[in-house]
Structures are given as C-alpha cells and as structure tokens.
C-alpha cells in the first residue's frame, strides 16, 4: 500500500518567469543584465553547455523561427531538482525579454503589442509549437539541436525572479535600472505571485549597487534577495529554490547564503576537482610526447576527469593537460642537461687532463682544442640544428654524448674553469703529498708503531694543513707506517733466524713457558732490530710465537719464506725434471686407487649441495672423470645437507677421505649452516690422529643462479661471505657472472680453479705419493741429505742443475718429490745414492729418526741467519756422520769487500776443521759447479757407512725399548708436528693392527736384510763390541707396541718370538716408511689406546712405563726412574749427555767409544747450550711452582713412593731390572678421592655415589647409562674410534652437570657429540666408589682364565659371573651387551672386541698394582673383558659358545712362534701382540707361558 501511495504522488511542477531590465541599447545599455546566463546556468549547469553570449538583436527570420516563434520570451526547458528537503520537483523556466530587429534596431512586432513591463507581468503564456532555447547558434539551425516543445504550447506562471544587474554596465545608469525595476515590481505585485530579487553578475558587482539593491528590497515587504553569479555558478540554484519555497508554502524556508560565502564553497569545490584531475593527468601522462586526443579518451570514464570538465569545461581541462606536457618536456630537457653537465668534467679529464696544455686557454680556445682530440667524438656530438634542447636530440636516449653546442652555455664555461682549478689544486696537493712523504722518510722521529698523535708535531706545518685534510696525511702516514713496520718485521724475522740455535736449544713446544719467553727477550733485547718494534710489543711477541710454532711445527706453510720455501722450489724442479715417471712408478700409480682421485665434499643446505653435485657431474665424462690441464682425474663427490654429527652426513667415512670441501650458501641461514657444520666437523676430530679435517682446504661460494650481481641483499651476502672466509681462512669465490648460462650455480672455470687448488693441497700433503717398499730402500747404497736455507740469495736451480742434468740422475723409487737417485763411481765400485734435497727445517726431524749416511749443508756467506741455521742443525748430528759444508758467495771481489762474507767464510771453514768435515765455497756468479766437487765427501761416507748403519740400528731398537714419551718432547728428536712437504703416516687412515706386522709378504725381505746386515758386521772386527752391545740390548728390552711397559729379562731360548718382533719393529721403524719422512702427530701405535689415557710428556724424570694404578682411584700413574739425568734434553735421545742410561746402566765401554754429537766437538756449536740445562721441557701449565719442589726431592736422594732404590751389583740382573721398574714403598699409599670432572664446580648427588643408590629393583640400570647407550646406539655406532677418542672435558662436565639437575635430559636436543657422551659414560663408572667388577670377583676371574681348555674356561667364567652382586650383574650385562653391538660394526667404527676391551678394562676393573701378580695379570684382565664381549650371548643369554673370528686350525694365529733371532729363515707365524710385558720368572704365570699363548690364539 505504501509503495502504491508513493507511486501515486505526483512530482510538483512550477513555472517560473525570469524578468528584468530589457529593451533597446538605450534602455539597457550595451549588454543585458544577465537573465539568459542565469537561465542557462540553472537549466544546463555543465561548463561546456554554458554560453556567455545570448544576443537579443535578431533578424526577422530568426525572430519568426520556431525557437523565438514571434514571441518576446524564451522557453528554456524543463528542470528537475531535489530541494533541501530531498523532495524532487520540476520547473519550467521562461525568460521575458525584448528582441530587437537587426535592421531597424527597434523591438520586433509581435502578436502582443504591450510594453515590456506589462508583458513581463503576464501569468498566462501561450505559443504553439515553441521550441526549447539553447543558445544563439541554435537560431536558424534548429534541426542540429534537441527539439523539445513548450508543454501544450502554454504556461501559467507561478512566480517571478526579478533580476538586477549590480555590475558596472556600459552606457547604463544604475539608478535608472532601479526605477525600471521598481515599476516592474509594482506591476508584478499586482499578480499576487511570489517574487524574488536576484542580483546578477555579483562576480563583477559594485558594492554601492548591491547595497542600494538591498535597500530597495527592504523597502518592500517580505522581498528576499539572492546574490548570484551565473559565470561562477554561485547561488544560481539557490535563487530558484528560494522562489519555489515561496510558491509552495508547505516547504521549509531556504537559507539564503551570502555571495562571498557561496563563492568560497564553489571555489573549494573547483580546486578539489582540479587537484584530482591534475593527479589523474600526472598518473596517466608520463611522456612529453603524448597528445590530448588519446589521453582524453583514456580519461573519459574517470570521475576526476568528469567532475572537472563539469565544473570548468573541456577547454580548461585541455589547458591543464598542455601545461603538464610542457612541464614534462622541461623536466626532461633539464635532466638531459644535468647529465651532460655531469659528464662534461669527465670529458675534460679524459681529453685535456694535462694542466700544461690548457693552463692559459680560454673556453673558446679550449673548445677548438677539444675538436682536435682523437677521442672527441666519443664524448661529444655535433648537431646540425641548434640549440640542442629544441631538436629531436632530446629524445635520442641511446646517444649519451654531449651536444657540442652546450659548450657555448655559461654552465659549461663555469665547469671548464672548475676543471682548470681542479688541475691546479691537484698539482699542488701532489706536491704537498710528495713533500710530506719526504718528511716522513727523512725524519728520525718516525719509528715503527709510533702513533699519529705523537708524530704529527714533528712533521706537520701550516702549508700541509692548507692544502690537504688531516685524514689524507693520516692515510699517507698509515701507509708509511705499514712499510716501515713490514720492513722492521722482516728484519726482526731475520734476527730470529740468526738466533736459531737459541730456539732449538730451548726445546720449545707449542706453548712455551714464561721463563723461556723471558730468556728469548733477554738474549735479543740489546739487538737494534728487537728495539725497533718496541712500540709494537704485542706484534713482536706474536712474531716470536709464530717463529716458535715454525720451530716446533716446521712446514712449507709456516716457513718464514713462504711461498718461496726451498721445499716447494725443490719439488717443482724435481717434478719438472722427471715428467715421465719410471715403469715402477707407473705400476704403483695404477695400483694406487687414490693417485688420480679427488674426493670432494659439497656442503650446503636446502638442496644446494645436491644441485651443485649434479651440475659438476654433468661436466664430467660418463665414468665421473674430470679433465684438468689435459690430465684426467677421477672425481668423487659427497654432497652433505644435514647435521654433520650424524654418521650419514659425516665428512669422512672408511671409504671416503676428503681432499677438500665446497661450502655453498645463498642466504644468511645457509651461511650459518656452513659455519656451524665446519665448526662441528673440526670439533669432532680434535684429539684424533686423523684430525686433518681441521686443515681441510675449504672454498666458500655464494650461489647466484641468475647471475644477478646487483641489489643490497646480494652485496650484504658477499660481505658476510668474505668475513666468514677470512675467519675460516678459506678461499671465497664471487658469484658467477651473468654470462655463464641459464640455471648454473657455478661455472666450469670456477670448478677447475677449485680442483686445481685441491690438487696442490693434496700434493703438499703427499696424499698421492706412494710409500717406498723395503726392496726399494734396500737397493740404495747411500742416503745423503742436502740441506738448503730458505730465503738465501741464491737460486736452488743453480745448485741442483749439476745433479738433475747428470746422466746418472734418476727419479726416486719411493715416489718422494724431494729425492733423486744417483749412480756414481766411488772408489772402484758404482754406488747408488739417494739424494734428498730439503730445507733445514725439514731436515731437523730426520737427524735421529731416519738413516742418513751424510749431510751436504749449504749456507750463504753474506747472510748470518743462513750460517746460524747450519750451526743449529749440526748441534744434534752424531759425530760419525760425514758433513760437507758449502759456502755460497758472490765472487772473490765481494768476499774481499764484504767483512761479513769474510767472517762467515772463515767461521764455516773453522767449523769444518773442528768436526773433521769438508768445506768448499762456490761463487753464485759461477754458472754451475760440478758434481765431482763432492766425490771426496762421498768417499768419506762410504768409509763410515757400516758404523753409521750399526749405530742407527742400535739407537732405533733402544728407542723402541724405552719410553715413548722421550720421542715427543723435543723438536730435534722428531717433532711430533713436523711434516713439512713429506708424506703423512698412512696409519691414520686405516686402523693399525695389534700385531707387529700386517702384511706377511714383507717378512722375507726383512729377514734377508737381517742376514745381510749380520754378514757385514761379522766381517768388521772393529764393530765387535757394538754388535755384542746391540745384542745385549735386544736381550734386555722388548719394544712396546701399545704403550710403555716395564723392561723384563728373559732367555732367548724361551722367547725368541718376542725378540724377533722387537728387532723387526726397529727395522720397520727405520725402513718401512718413506725415507726422510718426519713423524706424524702424537700417534700411539695401538689404535685402541684411549686418547685420554695417553701419557703426556713429563719433565725432569724419565717415565719407565704407565699403567692404571690404585683400584680406589682409577687413575693413570707413572712409575719413573729418577736416576736418569734430568738435564739431558729429555727427548733428543742423546746418550752422550747422560751420566747413566736405562739401556746401558752398569756397562762400561771397552773397545769403541759411543758416538757423540757435533756440539761436543766444536766450540762454535751450541753457544746457547747453557740454556738447554736450565729448563725442563714443558709449557706454563707443566712448569708451575711444583718444579722447585720436584727438583728438591730429586736432589735429596731416593725418596718418595715412586723412587727406585739402587741395588748391589752382584744381584741377579733380571731381578734387579724388574725391581728397579716396579719397586714401591712398602707403605701402602693412602687412598685419595678420584679427581672427577664433575666434582670440580659442584657437589653431585648422582655421580661418584655407590651403584646401589642410583638403581632400583624396577629400574636396575642407571638412567644416565641407559640414556648414554641409547644415544650412542642411535647416532654413534658408525663413529670411527668410538670409546677410543675422548670427548671434550668441558662438554663432559656440562653434560653431567645438566643431567644432575634434570634426569629427563634429552641428549639429542643438546647436540652433544658422540665422543662426549661416550666419555661421560666411562666417567660414570670411573667415579663409582667400587669398580663395576668387584675386587673379590677379579681374583676368581683371573683363576678361571688360567684354565687351558677353552670351553671349561668359558663355563668357569660364567660361574664367577653368577656370583656378582645383583646390581653389578645387571649393569655389567647391559654394558657388555652394548659393547657387543658396537663390535659388530667394527668394519665401520674400527673398534673390535679386542679394541673395546683395551679401552674398557681399566674402567670396569681398576685393579690394584701393589703386587707383582696384579701387575702381570693386566693382559689377563683385558682378555677377560674381551671374552665377555665376544661371548656375550653365551654369558648372558644362554646361547651356545660362538667360534672366534680368524681361529681356524692351521691359521697363523693358531701356531706357536718358532722364528729364530737374526736368521734368514722366513717368518711364517704372527704371534699374539704383547699388550703387556711377558711374565717374569717370579710370576706364577711363567710355567704357563707357552700354553697360554697357544690358548689365547685359540680364543
């Protein structure tokens, strides 16, 4: 119903007549009062439809047309409006005017002949078919406009708008207008229709006229006035709506807004529309080449465009568009101008950089000069049309050359003047820099390390400050400081080399004591080169420590002359001389699978490693071969993307030994993964023999697949990568360039670069060199070492040329890159000589460890350091080895003119005389010396060959029978880290056997060598004593293959096997490895030896052996012989300085004197020998305040628990030696609490308590042990050396502390290493008050183990096992079961049941060694634990007895050893390893020796 009512309501319609002054020009003036404009704006308010010109002068035809229709009024049409009360209405608008004839200029005659005043007041208007009026142009062209007739041809007027023009009209008097209006109003009032006064043209209004109009309105009753402006569209609608409100009384009264307030609102509306339109134009129009037609079409539908066109019209919109286009063009030209002006100084610098050429030229002349330059057209372009900014050149974006007519502008002239001034200033600044640098070089106050603040006052003046900033001088000063500091460091390094004897005499290790560092500073303190670094004490100390590291760990990399180390030069010379290897080397290369193999780890998360591996494989051949420098290599890739601590992601495996690692990243997260993985990998190998992963060559690569080398993120990643590469000391490769190819992470050039670097590193580590066989070494008659000094001013090529160019020179069989073979006639026979050419620092390690028949030592006569190194080297050479000194000079003239050369030549000659060596000098200017020069020396070597070899054999066997600790204290005695350019021990790659020989095939050659050696000795009467003495040593010592054990006497007829093994061990040590190869890192021969139990080097006392001691403590203690001289250099093996010797105590030399060192024969050698006896070997940690106390105790005689009491000489020697080794104070030592890593900082309620307190009947296994074993079995069963390699002590302590606080600790979450967890588990058992295997049970276990029958023995052990306390039995069963599972993975982890038993028996049993029986039972303890691990199913799970591996009847391990000593019979058996010394005569085990050996092999 409501809807129907609304539809029935009819829209009201009002007819309004607009009237005002009209007539001829005489009455209204030159223009009308604006009635037509008012009607036009109201009916058609759009700016484009608004017309200002509406003429009233018409022709007769126009007046008679259908629009005017012979009437003096116009029908404007119908308008629909919504008034203020939102009610819509319709209005018909009529304008009463008076049309003038264009001929007579008098009003046209119409049907109504009344005057205008009466005609205008008419309320009934009729005109048939009268059309709606638009504008003057419509007249006569009605068909071109919309034709809409006045409704019904008649209208009834409802109200009047009475217009008054308040502008200053031409030829019109305002007072006359008011009179006309007054008369018109009176006539209108008669109609009783509403009237509203409309003031038109208020935008041009006169204030007086407006005021008079308002006064007129006030004189009339209820006459309202509306101020309007049709042109500005102000209050037009208000005038009509006000009239409608008067017509319809029911409507609300309209508020009349003053003109200026309405104008302000209208202006704001227009301004807003304009802003929006301009924004639209700027968004759409970007180029100054756009045109209005296309842009207006684009904007047609935009409301911003529509609103502005409605208010201001299309023409104004177009005008704004053209202004925007002009602005764009201007901005474009200015940008181009700035670019040209910015490039102009660069053009000046390129074309006229010389001030002398243009110093006095004007800009015009300089312009002509520019045209003559060859590169003129590269910088400038000459245009046909000018100026350039009005030509099409502005749109030629590809041509960036400068328009030459720009030079005519003022800015270009200014830039030219600026260029001249810049050149002049640069010349002056260069002069100032040069003068400042001269001041620095001549000033005596500028010393290395002096801060700028201190130096400034000495060298600065006002002129310097005037021309340059202080930062420039600081930069020059910094560079100068760097130069003089580098020079001072080089000189200081030379000083350190000149004092080489001091460093070697002090026997420095990796961590020198404060006392030794003090001695170094005291000795060097008065040297000017030492004082030169006074202000750089930290760097000076660092250089000293670096030099100490070089002395202790001499390699090509640590060599002060690196990369010009002699070893590298020699390798290059020898390798280039023998390009084509011998047949034997070819055969070895073919048989060695790693000779041409590169193992590469690729590390990168999120698929980076896998993708790069695929890309590299795509560059390889079908069989994964890669060509480098024309040679094909086998490439083995191992991509890793996960946790490197997991076995599946380990860097190395038993079958994969990495030679290098590519580290990939493409984000901060992947870079963090690389850093964490490298650190974890390095941590996991610390303390292991195969810790070469710490020095694994790394290459860090930023993967940038698209080759994009821009962007802040990429630059940030590059900077971070460079920082990490510097931290890791590895190579950093920039991202691949864009031209590599789509989808590539790295290009082939970079891959080749990486692989070449790996090959170089691999060669340096000698990973590709083959090991010399014993047969190869046996073929050599003499082994000579030629020593050269790194950094000497001579060419190694000149020295080696006579050797390498000799027809007798051949490649070395052993594959060494430093050795050659010579066949020279010496005497009546030809001798095969192996000549090894090494640097001095490489030669130090072989003086005692390798068989050398003679040394040829070179030194430069004009370099002090060269002779000093020679002296240091000769100090530790035995006096039986011939020496050839060779001095290198610059010629006879230089020797005469140079005092230093003369002095050093004289000193070298005197040294040669004192040591009975040979001396010669060779001028460096001499093209080549001749090899015959050394023939007298070679004859000396041949004469002394037998005694040298006999002495070397003696020393090696004696060393094998003494403590292993003595070998590792001094760098002279074979530095443990001395591996310069020589082959590393291969034993780090594969687990060493527990037998003395792994390959039986080498035994026959050994026996032949023994026979040969015997016959040589028999023919030499002068060596009878040495041979007898040598055999005596063998009869009294057994070489310990695992760790030092007590020396024991036994008869040859009973224990030939042990003797033969001892002799062969000495042979193997001296001959089986490559000649001249230094010892590797600390490498106990027994792989299963726990690293945390390896005895560290001791000071002052000689360690006889180390055994687990004190059952209540579980510590590793050392029994020492304090009779050994304390100041013998500890590890150098020199017997000459010993008052007595553990090897030769009680014997007297009767025939031949024992060899001594050259230091004792030459007064010029060992000038710092006094410091040698002043300090014990050790670091600060070992040389604490206890040293004084120990010295006092040693000087007071034989005191203390471990002192060895001397016995009478008539006592049985075997008994005396045993008791010397094992004699302890009869007073039993007081039990001491076991030092625990977990008790250091807190009291634990879990560790170190009785086992019964941490288990319950429901949980018989300690939860800590359960967690550790679960973690190890989940992640570590494949870890190489598990339980052998100790974990980090601090991590083990942290693990126990955290577990003590939280028994629910998740080991996997904490990311502990497997070795840390394994070590913590062993520590748990070590800290128990009583061992897991009770003491009472240990005696029974040993008795059961003595049973010969294997099956009976196992059942007896099982019966003893049943007597264990329940808690101990359950935990023991759990641990042994775990170890059994570990041993099943021995192919991967290399831990057999035997290895595991060696690691675990001291932890599980902790025997007391206060008695001889307990000591000799150590082998039994280990074997018992091994049986428990092997036969775990039988002992704990009622399974049948399993057969041991490798015990088949007739196998070598099941046969008794029968090899006689020093015979040529080939050895065919392989005896059980002597893990402990053989039983003594006092031991109850002696009668069972043979049967026990047989039984143990059977087991």
Swiss-Prot record:
UniProt lineage: Eukaryota, Metazoa, Chordata, Craniata, Vertebrata
Annotated consequence of substituting residue 1451 to A: Abolishes phosphorylation by MAPK, increases functional activity and enhances retention in peripheral membranes
Compartment(s) of residence: Cytoplasm, Cytoskeleton, Cilium basal body; Cytoplasm; Nucleus; Cell membrane
Domain FF positions: 270-327, 368-422, 429-483, 485-550
Source organism of the structure: Rattus norvegicus (Rat)
Role played: Rho GTPase-activating protein (GAP). Binds several acidic phospholipids which inhibits the Rho GAP activity to promote the Rac GAP activity. This binding is inhibited by phosphorylation by PRKCA. Involved in cell differentiation as well as cell adhesion and migration, plays an important role in retinal tissue morphogenesis, neural tube fusion, midline fusion of the cerebral hemispheres and mammary gland branching morphogenesis. Transduces signals from p21-ras to the nucleus, acting via the ras GTPase-activating protein (GAP).
Cysteine disulfide partners in this protein: none
Sites marked Arginine finger: 1284
Regions of compositional bias (Pro residues) in chain numbering: 1471-1484
Protein name according to UniProt: Rho GTPase-activating protein 35
Region feature (Has GTPase activity, required for proper localization): 1-266
Residue stretches making up the pG1 pseudoGTPase domain: 592-767
Domain text: N-terminal part (1-266) has GTPase activity. Required for proper cellular localization. The pG1 pseudoGTPase domain does not bind GTP.
Processing and modification events after translation: Phosphorylation of Tyr-1105 by PTK6 promotes the association with RASA1, inactivating RHOA while activating RAS. Phosphorylation at Tyr-308 by PDGFRA inhibits binding to GTF2I. Phosphorylated by PRKCA at Ser-1221 and Thr-1226, induces relocalization from the cytoplasm to regions of plasma membrane ruffling and prevents the binding and substrate specificity regulation by phospholipids. In brain, phosphorylated by FYN and SRC. During focal adhesion formation, phosphorylated by MAPK1 and MAPK3 at the C-terminal region, probably at Ser-1451, Ser-1476, Thr-1480 and Ser-1483.
Gene3D superfamilies: FF domain (1.10.10.440), P-loop containing nucleotide triphosphate hydrolases (3.40.50.300), Rho GTPase activation protein (1.10.555.10)
Example of a GO MF term: GTPase activity
